[in-house]
Structure formats: C-alpha cells, structure tokens
C-alpha cells in the first residue's frame, strides 16, 4: 500500500480489525501493512465459550511484535456470547467467568483495551445494574474495559448514549467507552446532519475524556433502523459524517477502528475514500 495512505492511517490514528489466523504474533505485522498504529482483534474464537490458553511464549512474541512494528495501542474484542446483563443467573455467571477470562487473556498480552457488548435484558434497569455489578466484581485490572454502544435491536442494552453513561457512571478511568458509528446511526443518532449535537450528547452523558476509542463503520441500513449492518466507509448511509469524526480535533489521539465488510481486503479502499474527502 502506498505511503500516502499509510500516513493518513497513522496521522488520524485509524486502525482496523485484524485477523489472528496462524497466531496472535502475526497480527501486528498485518496491521503495519496499512500504516496502523492501533488495531483490534479477537484473542480467542468469539463464538465459543472455551478457549486454548495463551502460552507465555505466544504472549511474549505478540508483545515483541507490537513493539517492533511501532503499534501504540491494541484492542481485544470480547466474545459475542458474553451477556453480563442477563436475567438468567446461570448465563450471567457463565458470562462473568468468560469476561474475567477475557480480561486475563488481554492482560497477558499487554493489550490496551478490552471492548465488550453490554448484553440484553427485558428490564433495562436490572440489566444495567447487573453489568455494573459484574464490573465491580472484577479484581484490579490494568487493561481498560470499554463498553460498546449497540444498534438497539430487541432487548439489547446500550443503544442510547444515556444508557452507556449509566453503565460507566461511578467507575474510575479504568472503565470507559467505545462508540461504534454504525450502531449509533442504527439507534437513531444522525452523525452526518447533526454531528455537533451527537458529539455534545456524548460529552454531556459520558464525557469525551471517557470515550477512549471508536469503531469506524459506515451503515448499510437507514437511520434509526435498529439494524446492525456495517458498510465500507463512504458506501453507506453515514458517509461524510465519518469524515467529520475523523478530522475532529477533540477526538485526536483516540483509536478509530474499522470493522467494515471484507476486513483487511478492503481497508485500502476505505483509506482512499478518507484521503479523498480529507483533501490530503
């Protein structure tokens, strides 16, 4: 990939979700191909409860590769199966155990962030309480725990900025937020036409200082559809709103992770669109 595109990724702290096929230690080099200084990955199969432990050798190789490729932050995405909000005591406990394991795995490889979905519960207040209780029960952790906003499908918690703010309220800076732009759009936040209102609401309900990262995704479906379908940047319904976010000086230094269709195969296309719209 040409150096101009790499410089865009580096300058605006844009990264992407990277495959760990063949081993965790291969991910940093894959990220560096695009000029990424940050990237996201799964440390285990995201659709299974069980996992193979990360060996000390594998952890050290990963940490060494992160350093040698000048990666400044890494984000683990937790399993999709985890539902800390569940009204089922059995599922809640199983989810909590998996959550703790995810934290331990992230810390073993010196990951900067662990992002997780809030989960679902027909009773929002109960769900939020159970999520907060789970976070409180976690022993001291050095990896930052990031709650991700949701698209608003079914009984899923966290589609409103206010709910995300409720979840992190009362915790110190080791707990923060990752805002997914596609999810926000699907939940009814008009990032394109009402960008400043969106940022103002993030600041008032959460605090920009507690938003540590973004998932930079365009949206395939309409505003307020509650349908979570990511699209390539510039090919979806959000479009220019993402450029506003990327170039917003208030958000500089916060990782912006692409989770777009076709993964690494289309990151270059995303970056070309971004470069064109930025005029660089």
Swiss-Prot record:
It catalyses: Endonucleolytic cleavage to 5'-phosphooligonucleotide end-products. The keyword Hydrolase applies. Zn(2+) 2 binds at residues 148, 180, 215, 259. Pfam families: AP_endonuc_2. The keyword DNA repair applies. InterPro entries: AP_endonuc_2, AP_endonuc_F2_Zn_BS, Xyl_isomerase-like_sf, Xyl_isomerase-like_TIM-brl. Keywords: DNA damage, DNA repair, Endonuclease, Hydrolase, Metal-binding, Nuclease, Zinc. GO terms for biological process: base-excision repair. Zn(2+) 1 binds at residues 77, 117, 148. Its cofactor is Zn(2+). Zn(2+) 3 binds at residues 183, 228, 230. CDD domains: AP2Ec. Binds 3 Zn(2+) ions. Its EC number is 3.1.21.2. GO terms for molecular function: deoxyribonuclease IV (phage-T4-induced) activity; DNA binding; DNA-(apurinic or apyrimidinic site) endonuclease activity; phosphoric diester hydrolase activity; zinc ion binding. PROSITE patterns: AP_NUCLEASE_F2_1, AP_NUCLEASE_F2_2, AP_NUCLEASE_F2_3, AP_NUCLEASE_F2_4. Endonuclease IV plays a role in DNA repair. It cleaves phosphodiester bonds at apurinic or apyrimidinic (AP) sites, generating a 3'-hydroxyl group and a 5'-terminal sugar phosphate. Belongs to the AP endonuclease 2 family. This is Probable endonuclease 4. It comes from Thermoplasma volcanium (strain ATCC 51530 / DSM 4299 / JCM 9571 / NBRC 15438 / GSS1). The lineage of its organism: Archaea, Methanobacteriati, Thermoplasmatota, Thermoplasmata, Thermoplasmatales. The gene is nfo.
């Amino acid at each position: 990939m040409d150096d101009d595109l790499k410089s865009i990724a580096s300058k605006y702290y844009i990264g992407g979700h990277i495959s760990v096929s063949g081993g965790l230690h291969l991910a940093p080099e894959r990220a560096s191909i695009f000029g990424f200084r940050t990237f996201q990955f799964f440390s285990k199969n995201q659709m299974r409860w069980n996992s193979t432990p990360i060996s000390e050798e594998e952890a050290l190789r990963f940490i060494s590769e992160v350093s040698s490729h000048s990666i400044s932050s890494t984000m683990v995405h937790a399993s999709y199966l985890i539902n800390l909000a569940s009204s089922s005591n059995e599922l809640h406990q199983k989810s909590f155990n998996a959550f703790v394991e995810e934290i331990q795995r992230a810390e073993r490889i010196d990951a900067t962030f662990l992002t997780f979905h809030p989960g679902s519960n027909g009773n929002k207040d109960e769900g939020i309480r159970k999520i907060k209780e789970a976070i409180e029960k976690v022993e001291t952790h050095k990896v930052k725990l990031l709650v991700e906003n949701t698209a608003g499908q079914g009984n899923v918690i966290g589609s409103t900025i206010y709910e995300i703010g409720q979840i992190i309220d009362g915790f110190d800076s080791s707990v923060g937020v990752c805002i997914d732009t596609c999810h926000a759009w699907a939940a009814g936040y008009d990032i394109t036409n009402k960008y400043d209102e969106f940022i103002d609401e993030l600041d008032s309900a959460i605090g920009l200082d507690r938003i540590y990262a973004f998932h930079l995704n365009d949206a395939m479906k309409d505003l307020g559809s509650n349908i979570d379908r990511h699209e390539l940047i510039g090919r979806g319904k959000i479009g220019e709103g993402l450029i506003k976010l990327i170039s917003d000086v208030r958000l500089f230094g916060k990782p912006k992770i692409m989770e777009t269709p076709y993964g690494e195969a289309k990151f270059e296309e995303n970056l070309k669109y971004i470069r064109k719209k930025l005029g660089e």
